[in-house]
């Protein structure tokens, strides 16, 4: 997405062909463009995605047309789809863990992780489950279904789009200049988040890892920088995906709603990666009984869902612990009413501290590194509070931190909204979007390519 070839060659060519193609052929154009887009970076793993599309398409039809074998068709789609995800993403993790516990020496498979497999697998699963539940009819057109699963704006890193949310638009979507303009604005805002904010925070994170400089302040700068980096990186991709979807006539679900304004961890997860949280709620948590079970069964449901949420993000123990950490925090908020009675400022501060520290665990390459990072944050091992080099980096990145903090709130959005409908507002918006495109292009031409963090999931 955030590359010169995509912005100035692939995207204009696809949009030109798409809008010149008659309505009946538009989904075929999208499917072909999406397969080219995926094959551009993962050609040898493209057949895996095509197979998953074909599998869930056939299973969806089987579920709808069969009276006695609906569950068999559903289980087939779930077992094979989850099996493929498990083999490619988790096989080495489980083999390595088994070897460590038992002393065995089972060789690792070293399989390449297909880009976006967690996202398109969850989309396919939600489709077959919804067809089984009778929530949606099966899609009869393989081209339409393939376009839904492989749709290039959100294929790689979400949001996780459910078939039910865009079923009508797959066949009867509307296009307009207003939709296209709104979509392009959203796309450019997302591009700016990624290129100007996320990538520059990534530079500071790289400096922290490579400089060898250790002080308590530098560890905290790193922790806050990564929390802002992952937010702008992931929400930037979501903005770009939602914006491009709007240009093409689709209305994807929102994926972020200023999560760092949350007053509780529960609220944070209603605002962060919304499509993933709702997916686990509707397809795992509620089918397990949700909160309508005994207290200890409910606790087990919470622990299971959040362990799976952690594993969804990556095949490593730090992700498992990251998920269980949030499970513990959510349970604490339910069991300790005093947390909700704290003054708003204290509740907000506790959530920010918990989230920032959780992302230190999330970003660690190993549990050993996580332990080292936490020790540094709290000054263990005789670390100095600060140093001349740390203060230099703080001054150098102070403006970026201010922009990042402001950008994680609706301050800019609210200011722009107050100027909606005015001539000055229209001129300023157009100038701002043009300037944003120019600045982002300059960054992309001058710098090295920095992939989105969630591509690896």
Predicted regions and their residues:
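Membrane-embedded transmembrane alpha-helical bundles that form the catalytic cores
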Residues: 1-456
